[in-house]
Amino acid sequence: MLHLIYISIIVVLIIILISYTRKPQYFRITAPRSVALFHGIHPLNPKNYKTFSEEFETILNNAIEDGDFKGQLTEPCSYALRGGKYIRPIILMEIVRACQLQHSFGAPIYPAEAALAVEYFHVASLIIDDMPSFDNDVKRRNKDTVWARFGVAKAQMSALALTMQGFQNICRQVDWIKENCPRFPDPNQLGALLCTFVSHSLNSAGSGQLVDTPEKTIPFFKIAFIMGWVLGTGTIEDIGAIERAAHCFGNAFQLADDIKDHDTDTGRNYAKIHGKRKTFDVVAQSLQECKKILHEKKIYTSIWNEIFQKVINVALGT
């Protein structure tokens, strides 16, 4: 009888050991969130621009309340992030959604952390762009710029905090995938790929900022498009095409802005050099090329009609 008990105990221990070794093992790169960023519409349900914008605003508010920014930088970072159009995070989230409609790895991926990252990077660049040593702007989004309200030193530190937190958000996105999507192929490789690509893109944006070219705008759309594609489990072989789509969209976005600022811009402005009509034609051609690629990769959805129209409206001044 005693032998049977010993044998039973050994069998149970073996089963526990096998179960443990078969369970996916991972370590967290980041501390877990104290609150969920969003509860609401299922990640794969279709959404219009307004719904996406409201969803991201909720994500942003929760992230700020959860302590994405610390101490004296909380107020200027929060101030800088309010009132945006959120077009870059919306693009990222929609590309992830569209990719997963074609193929998925178990639970749907919810890219809230990645969406925060791309917005943080973008807003950091706006803070720097407005500084006295660059454009010396005192107004943005119908309110004081960050440096004008909080001073140059806090503006510089806020831009740095936003950038650093953006990389933290990417790491948090990888951790989220590890915990919620066990069939996702090699999340650690994903994290390394995203951080390397983002670092390269931010370097390009910085170089573009120094010479005041579209290269200060396009890299942030490349981050949104390519992070969305990779997180949505799009193929690595197609990244070049997605990057081309992002370049076309970013170029159209910048040139539409040049048309809008034709009469007030004192820096380099394509519309002032080539005329509004020719510039508008390039905007339309760039959007058409972007649309063609998105169709080819089967990620063109109805919300893109709204996104493209917003760019056209900027160019038309409506």
Curated annotation (Swiss-Prot):
Its cofactor is Mg(2+). One of its GO terms (cellular component) is membrane. It comes from the Viruses. GO terms for molecular function: (2E,6E)-farnesyl diphosphate synthase activity; dimethylallyltranstransferase activity; geranylfarnesyl diphosphate synthase activity; geranylgeranyl diphosphate synthase activity; metal ion binding. Its EC number is 2.5.1.-, 2.5.1.1, 2.5.1.29, 2.5.1.10. Induction: Expressed in the late phase of the viral replicative cycle. It catalyses: isopentenyl diphosphate + dimethylallyl diphosphate = (2E)-geranyl diphosphate + diphosphate; isopentenyl diphosphate + (2E)-geranyl diphosphate = (2E,6E)-farnesyl diphosphate + diphosphate; isopentenyl diphosphate + (2E,6E)-farnesyl diphosphate = (2E,6E,10E)-geranylgeranyl diphosphate + diphosphate; isopentenyl diphosphate + (2E,6E,10E)-geranylgeranyl diphosphate = (2E,6E,10E,14E)-geranylfarnesyl diphosphate + diphosphate. The chain crosses the membrane at residues 1-21. Pathway: Isoprenoid biosynthesis; farnesyl diphosphate biosynthesis; farnesyl diphosphate from geranyl diphosphate and isopentenyl diphosphate: step 1/1; Isoprenoid biosynthesis; geranyl diphosphate biosynthesis; geranyl diphosphate from dimethylallyl diphosphate and isopentenyl diphosphate: step 1/1; Isoprenoid biosynthesis; geranylgeranyl diphosphate biosynthesis; geranylgeranyl diphosphate from farnesyl diphosphate and isopentenyl diphosphate: step 1/1. It is found in: Host endoplasmic reticulum; Host membrane. PANTHER family: FARNESYL DIPHOSPHATE SYNTHASE. This is Trans-prenyltransferase. It comes from African swine fever virus (isolate Pig/Kenya/KEN-50/1950) (ASFV). The lineage of its organism: Viruses, Varidnaviria, Bamfordvirae, Nucleocytoviricota, Pokkesviricetes.
